[in-house]
Design a protein with these regions (language model features):
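Intrinsically disordered, low-complexity
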Residues: 1-98, 163, 183-201
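Secreted/periplasmic proteins that engage bacterial cell-wall peptidoglycan
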Residues: 43-161, 169-170
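Generic preference for hydrophobic/aromatic residues in regular secondary structure cores
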Residues: 127, 178, 196-199
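Exported/periplasmic cell-wall-interacting domains
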Residues: 150-153, 160, 179-180, 188-192
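A broad, low-specificity signal marking well-ordered, structured residues that form hydrophobic/aromatic
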Residues: 155, 166, 194
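Short solvent-exposed strand/turn elements
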Residues: 165-189
Length: 201
């Protein structure tokens, strides 16, 4: 990408070489901070630490068989669901309605999965950041855990692990737009940044 395309006959630019620091040096020859093991220390770390999230699966992970307290998700489309078929919002609305903890339909940009936390709070729902509960909605801000940078994502908490990670059910992750529901383990680091929403009985 650059301003001028690379030409085959152009000389390859000389790249800087750096001495690998030993454990007794706090900086390498380029002046980059290193730790006691010689690893580079990022002076401007990201504020978002997501840990390692699991890969989505279309079947319940075997280690959760017999642990879930909620009924398995069904394939019904519940009344009042005006979200586009197959979207994460469509799936979360149906799942929450199925378990008797519905969250109302939100319009416009308020309906984006990543906005559900703020939208629900404005409507008087109980919303807690970083505090998961089984059967609550889980709203991921844009870009978190691989979600769309603009729309974010919404899932439903199915199980809370002792280590602080959670199992969620979600749609529009596997085979986008198909309506297929999948399962995924979300790390405790990611959980800390998620808005959890209690539906209304």
């Amino acid at each position: 990408y650059g301003e001028a395309p690379y030409k085959a006959n152009s000389p390859i630019p000389k790249l800087p070489t750096y001495k690998i620091p030993n454990k007794n040096e706090s900086k390498n020859t380029a002046g980059v901070d290193v730790d006691e093991d010689g690893c580079v220390v990022n002076p401007n770390p990201s504020g978002e630490v997501t840990g390692k999230n699991g890969a989505p699966t279309q079947t319940l992970p075997p280690e959760y068989i017999g642990k879930l307290t909620l009924p398995m998700p069904d394939d019904k489309n519940y009344a009042g669901n005006s979200y586009p078929f197959g979207q994460c919002t469509w799936g979360a609305y149906n799942r929450l309605a199925q378990i008797g903890m519905p969250i109302e339909w939100f319009s416009g940009d308020s309906a984006n999965g990543g906005n559900w936390g703020e939208s629900a709070k404005a409507k008087g729902y109980k919303v807690e950041k970083g505090k998961p509960h089984i059967g609550w909605g889980a709203s991921f801000h844009g870009g978190l855990a691989g979600s769309d940078p603009t729309a974010g994502h919404i899932a439903v908490v199915e199980y809370v692990n002792p280590d602080g990670s959670i199992l969620v059910s979600e749609t529009n992750v596997v085979k986008a737009g198909s309506g297929l529901r999948s399962w995924r383990v979300i790390s405790k680091e990611t959980v800390a940044q998620v808005n959890f929403i209690q539906g209304r009985k």
